[in-house]
């Protein structure tokens, strides 16, 4: 069986599809933009980001789709995700069927109590954000760091540069701190070469 990182590297040869899903106000649209820019502007890869959200400013459904590839990207939306990030129960219930058989589901255990698959990796993302920055809104940056550290698809340096470029003025340091906490959680989980298996 492949580790998450091995599967991500293999998928990147064709296209690595990421679906970030949750509620409006969680910062997932910005997280998707940062992930795409980290890959394309700072990582030398091709990337496309699309987004969708409900009419509510906060609390409605929100998702950001990011396709990353070494070659050209011929279709701009996620068909079957290599990685699904669920930041709400509704997102988890709705989108887990869109994950590839050998794909990975990362769940914010702070907000999701019913995990639909034994393949899911549960992480208290929102709790970590509150602990590290005192702001729950930075959970999307914790999640981005965790996804980056888990998959290795985009380097930590590329993500840091994209966060510094895109974070709202005056919040760069806080967002970089949240990103670092996500990477640290991925490292803690991977431990001594004990990488998670999603398949």
State what each model feature region is.
Residues 1-199:
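Active-site cofactor/cluster-binding pocket
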């Amino acid at each position: 069986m492949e580790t998450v990182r091995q599967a991500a590297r293999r998928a990147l040869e064709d296209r690595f599809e990421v679906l970030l899903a949750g509620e409006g106000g969680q910062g997932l649209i910005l997280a998707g933009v940062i992930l795409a820019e980290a890959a394309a502007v700072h990582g030398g890869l091709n990337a496309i980001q699309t987004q969708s959200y409900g009419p509510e400013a906060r609390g409605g459904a929100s998702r950001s789709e990011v396709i990353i590839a070494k070659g050209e990207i011929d279709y701009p939306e996620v068909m079957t995700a290599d990685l699904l990030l669920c930041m709400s129960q509704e997102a988890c219930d709705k989108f887990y069927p869109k994950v590839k058989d050998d794909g990975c589901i990362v769940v914010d255990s702070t907000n999701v109590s019913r995990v639909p698959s034994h393949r899911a990796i549960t992480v208290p993302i929102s709790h970590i954000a509150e602990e590290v920055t005192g702001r729950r809104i930075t959970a999307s940056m914790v999640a981005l760091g965790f996804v980056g550290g888990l998959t290795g698809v985009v380097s930590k340096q590329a993500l840091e540069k994209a966060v510094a470029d895109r974070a709202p003025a005056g919040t760069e340091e806080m967002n970089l701190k949240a990103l670092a906490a996500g990477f640290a959680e991925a490292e803690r989980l991977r431990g001594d070469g004990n990488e998670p298996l999603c398949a």
